[in-house]
């Protein structure tokens, strides 16, 4: 018999110490990595539930194992909420990650060797959109599209590439692009050559759910997302579609199970259901509106302090600082800010002269700081501290002074009260 009072602290002190240290790190550091966020205690409650014990290969009502009557309810709730939230008529909530969801879409729609048009990783795309080190770049013929001199997606070049190479699929979406994507324009380009339009909205799903960013679901043949990032749920993936055929939906389901995965993670699917319900609440819309406001407020400070922001601003939750003119590398900036308990990630910028392991920029996102209660006043102050460090990157006294301010503001705005 298993006793409910069993705990990690008494059994595995070494592991528990690391877990506790991570808890402290999250409370005492300001998180500005654009893909990170803080999930709710309700989501964590679902992830730590007895649902983790249940195998449920298949889909609701069509399982290979018995005893699935209650996990069927859980998964159907997640499916229905995903469809309602994003205006879809198909949803698959089983992918273990965004990359797994993307893999399933490739599997359902393409054959190895097919041509795909995807955003250049060096100009804002994602590994799974055709990077040569990823399955997408290894299995498919990838043609990259990019941005113009203003830092915006070059739709004219995209259309030209599509006409020339006749890809079977065009991918929309990004990991480091601060603009609004014209989904309708992308669908027009896809339709002109008879290609699928597949959108990976992982970074902006929360903004889309709140109506702060345009929804690709009405325009794309298939859409994927993660359920964390701006959506603030558990780590996992999701596939959506609207107006497609039952044949397409069957292909997508089969590409997830049994092609890519076995049993779904029912405790994570329950957590997805919780997060999707939370995303329907009025306060979630208020939160996402503040995410966008905070990103713009930070950009304003950096521009006023003489820093170059790729594309000159942001229309979502993230932006890139181009440090070439400051003679700084992203690696140096990342490390110096980290010593002040400010967490960012080094990131390549357009026409970056440095390697991806060094880079000439950093990516900054506002979802996590907004989640802990920061508004314009706080993020402007924060951006100013960051400029102080970047202006004096080798001055440890400046870094220590900023670190003290970071610890103070983190204490005033705890992640979990």
Swiss-Prot record:
Cofactor annotation: pyridoxal 5'-phosphate
InterPro entries in UniProt: PyrdxlP-dep_Trfase, PyrdxlP-dep_Trfase_major, PyrdxlP-dep_Trfase_small, Ser_HO-MeTrfase, Ser_HO-MeTrfase-like, Ser_HO-MeTrfase_PLP_BS, SHMT-like_dom
Annotated metabolic or biological route of this protein: One-carbon metabolism; tetrahydrofolate interconversion; Amino-acid biosynthesis; glycine biosynthesis; glycine from L-serine: step 1/1
UniProt-annotated location(s): Cytoplasm
Pfam families: SHMT
Residue positions binding (6S)-5,6,7,8-tetrahydrofolate: 121, 125-127, 355-357
The keyword Cytoplasm is assigned to this record: yes
Enzyme class per UniProt: transferase
One Gene Ontology MF term: glycine hydroxymethyltransferase activity
The reaction(s) this protein catalyses: (6R)-5,10-methylene-5,6,7,8-tetrahydrofolate + glycine + H2O = (6S)-5,6,7,8-tetrahydrofolate + L-serine
Tagged with keyword Cytoplasm: yes
Keyword terms, alphabetized: Amino-acid biosynthesis, Cytoplasm, One-carbon metabolism, Pyridoxal phosphate, Transferase
Site residues by UniProt (Plays an important role in substrate specificity): 228
N6-(pyridoxal phosphate)lysine modifications at: 229
One Gene Ontology cellular component annotation held by this UniProt entry: cytosol
Enzyme Commission designation: 2.1.2.1
Description of how the protein assembles with itself and partners: Homodimer.
Function: Catalyzes the reversible interconversion of serine and glycine with tetrahydrofolate (THF) serving as the one-carbon carrier. This reaction serves as the major source of one-carbon groups required for the biosynthesis of purines, thymidylate, methionine, and other important biomolecules. Also exhibits THF-independent aldolase activity toward beta-hydroxyamino acids, producing glycine and aldehydes, via a retro-aldol mechanism.
The protein's name in its UniProt record: Serine hydroxymethyltransferase
Native source species: Cronobacter sakazakii (strain ATCC BAA-894)
Upper classification of the organism: Bacteria, Pseudomonadati, Pseudomonadota, Gammaproteobacteria, Enterobacterales
